[in-house]
Structure formats: structure tokens, C-alpha cells
Amino acid sequence: NLLQFEMMILKMAGRSGIRWYSDYGCYCGKGGHGQPQDATDRCCFVHDCCYGKVSGCDPKDEFYKYSSDNNDIVCGGNNPCLKEICECDRDAAICFRDNLSTYNNKYWNVPSETCQVESEPC
């Protein structure tokens, strides 16, 4: 769920997902449309696509099982749908960590018209 995703981002990227990624580029935050603005925004695009492929449970509300050890997150549990959500969140948190250097304040709260071009397929 979103709280677990926030905790993964804190663990992997060392920063708050709510503070840093809730309104970034065209894909980080609510909705998503247009072209990803940079590698960080692409993390959110891929995360949105990943959530879009999940069926049978709600990515934003369901609790999943995971453990974290050192700098790694391991998704667990017997429910395949919940494990998929966990893997979407884990991969995005790792992507944020790996692309910290691309984060650019100019993409915070971008005007909606910036994101009106046609979206690329997942």
C-alpha cells in the first residue's frame, strides 16, 4: 500500500516519497500522462505501468509482506497479486535510489500543459 511504498522509498533512496515524488514530472503523484521528463519521472512511469498490469487486488490499499535487510528489499507472502504489488514498489524505490542524481527541482509541480502530449505505451 502507499504507506509501505513510502517506507521502501525512505529505505532505498533515503528520502520521503511524499515530500520528493508526490508532484514530480508527469508521472510522479496522481495520474500520469505525456512523456516522462527525466530518469526520475521515468521511474514513476514504469511504476504506473507495473500497477496497471496487476489484477485481483488494489495496489494502493492492500498490505503485502516484505522484509528489508541492509540495502535490499525482499517481497514475500503466498498471494501472487500482493507479491506483484510489492515488486512494483520495490523496483520503483530502487529506481529512485539509482537516479537520485537526475532529480531536478524544475520538474516539481510542472504545469499540466507540459504533460499533454501523447503518452508512450507501457
UniProtKB/Swiss-Prot annotation:
GO terms for molecular function: calcium ion binding; calcium-dependent phospholipase A2 activity; phospholipid binding; toxin activity. Transmembrane segments: none annotated. The keyword Secreted applies. Expressed by the venom gland. InterPro entries: PLipase_A2, PLipase_A2_Asp_AS, PLipase_A2_dom, PLipase_A2_dom_sf, PLipase_A2_His_AS. Its EC number is 3.1.1.4. It catalyses: a 1,2-diacyl-sn-glycero-3-phosphocholine + H2O = a 1-acyl-sn-glycero-3-phosphocholine + a fatty acid + H(+). Pfam families: Phospholip_A2_1. One of its GO terms (cellular component) is extracellular region. It is found in: Secreted. The active site is at H47, D89. GO terms for biological process: arachidonate secretion; lipid catabolic process; phospholipid metabolic process. The keyword Cell cycle does not apply. Its main location: secreted. Keywords: Blood coagulation cascade inhibiting toxin, Disulfide bond, Hemostasis impairing toxin, Hydrolase, Lipid degradation, Lipid metabolism, Metal-binding, Platelet aggregation inhibiting toxin, Secreted, Toxin. Disulfide bonds join C26-C115, C28-C44, C43-C95, C49-C122, C50-C88, C57-C81, C75-C86. Binds 1 Ca(2+) ion. Belongs to the phospholipase A2 family. Group II subfamily. D49 sub-subfamily. Monomer. Snake venom phospholipase A2 (PLA2) that impairs hemostasis. It weakly inhibits ADP-induced platelet aggregation when tested on platelet rich plasma from human and rabbit blood (15-25% of inhibition at 5-10 ug of enzyme), and dose-dependently inhibits blood coagulation, possibly by inhibiting thrombin activation. Exhibits high hydrolytic activities toward L-dipalmitoyl phosphatidylcholine. PLA2 catalyzes the calcium-dependent hydrolysis of the 2-acyl groups in 3-sn-phosphoglycerides. This is Acidic phospholipase A2 Tpu-E6c. It comes from Craspedocephalus puniceus (Flat-nosed pitviper).
